[in-house]
């Protein structure tokens, strides 16, 4: 696993790396490269996080720089669910259409099944991470 993080402080970089490593272990993902960019994502895109797939082993996660520690952990967990979906072939972008678990969808929204999975699991994994490692040292 290789993680490259840009656009934030050493303290946040350390937290981002720790959450990604935790999620890689929890999701049993191996031989994955993740590039993380922290920026004014919400101002520009009205989103706190994005995950895009370069191929089944290379991913870009974009994170908004204004997220507090709790939100940052939850958002990384959410985006890592998408990494798992892409890496396992559950989620495939076909031009502007999306193939999820062999069903073709015309578009994506927060109510899409792959987003529902990510929203449901982000809380479970974030709570487990916080219960294991705490967040006080990162705030």
At which residue positions do the language-model features occur?
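Short, aliphatic-rich beta-strand segments
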Residues: 2-5, 57-63
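Short alpha-helical functional segments enriched in proximate histidine and acidic residues
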Residues: 26, 83, 87, 121, ...
């Amino acid at each position: 696993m290789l993680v490259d993080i840009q656009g934030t402080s050493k303290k946040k970089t350390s937290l981002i790396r720790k959450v990604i490593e935790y999620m890689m272990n929890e999701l049993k993902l191996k031989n994955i490269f993740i590039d993380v960019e922290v920026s004014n994502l919400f101002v520009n895109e009205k989103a706190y996080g994005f995950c895009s797939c370069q191929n089944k082993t290379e991913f870009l996660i974009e994170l908004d720089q204004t997220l507090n520690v709790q939100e940052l952990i939850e958002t990384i967990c959410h985006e890592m669910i998408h990494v798992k979906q892409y890496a396992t072939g559950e989620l495939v972008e076909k031009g502007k259409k999306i193939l999820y678990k062999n069903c073709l969808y015309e578009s994506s929204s927060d109510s899409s099944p792959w987003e529902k999975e990510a929203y449901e699991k982000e809380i479970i994994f974030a709570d487990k991470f916080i219960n294991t490692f705490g967040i006080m040292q990162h705030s």
